[in-house]
Regions:
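Metal-dependent de-N-acetylase/amidase catalytic core
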Residues: 2-6, 48, 72, 78-79, ...
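Active-site rim/loop-helix segments in enzyme catalytic domains that contact anionic ligands
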Residues: 1-100, 129-130, 206
Length: 212
């Protein structure tokens, strides 16, 4: 049976930071891989200054998606930093899940400090009760009230360079954060690799995992 995995993210670049290595690895294992982004990903600061334009985010994401090799990418174009639970959004996500019928779903950790990440996590978890394999990832590493209970590590040593290349496509965001994301990802993946006996790894909190 053909295996399929959906990678959900609130914004363009979340999946790349949190689990691009795993996506690339699954693609090598003949999975069909899908990326679903909930927001348009452009945003302004508290003073109304545009920090990221929607069209630029879309172009950068397109380049990253090609590097990873997604079979299909979907953007639901909700407003960045204002994603809310509503029946229409639930319906859109459920239709995607039902159409693709994935064996695996990857989505944000529910304890994330970012509002959009938490909302997307809760939405997808609520709609994926029948999916056999569900994993939570982190796309930032800020301290939270909850502890991230990472309990599975995926060796991405061979996929690491391609993962970093996908993140590097988000030039506007990297410029804004002075490339700090790249070091953050390197440190996190190295630590996870050390913990699991390889050079680089991604860590996930397992909700469900069917081995046999």
């Amino acid at each position: 049976m053909l295996k399929k995995a959906i990678f959900f993210g609130a914004h363009d670049d979340d999946v790349e930071i949190g689990c691009a290595g795993t996506a690339i690895k699954l693609k090598k294992k003949k999975f069909k891989i899908y990326k679903v982004i909930i927001s348009s990903s452009g945003f302004k600061n508290e003073y109304g200054k545009t920090l990221r334009q929607n069209d630029i985010a879309e172009k950068e994401a397109s380049r990253a998606n090609k590097i990873i090799g997604f079979n299909e990418c979907i953007n639901l174009n909700e407003k960045t930093n204002e994603i809310i639970v509503n029946d229409l959004l639930k319906s859109k996500i459920l239709k995607i899940i039902n159409r693709i019928n994935p064996s695996h779903i990857f989505v944000h950790w529910s304890g994330d400090v970012h509002h959009d990440h938490r909302v997307v996590s809760d939405l997808v978890l609520g709609l994926s009760k029948r999916i056999e394999n569900v994993y939570l990832y982190r796309s930032n590493f800020f301290k939270s009230k909850k502890e991230f209970n990472g309990n599975i590590y995926i060796d991405i040593t061979k996929e690491y360079k391609k993962k970093i290349s996908s993140i590097e496509q988000y030039k506007t965001e990297l410029k804004r954060v002075k490339n700090s994301w790249l070091k953050m990802v390197e440190n996190e993946n190295k630590i996870n690799g050390y913990r699991s006996g390889c050079k680089y790894a991604e860590c996930f909190e397992v909700i469900r995992s069917k081995i046999l």
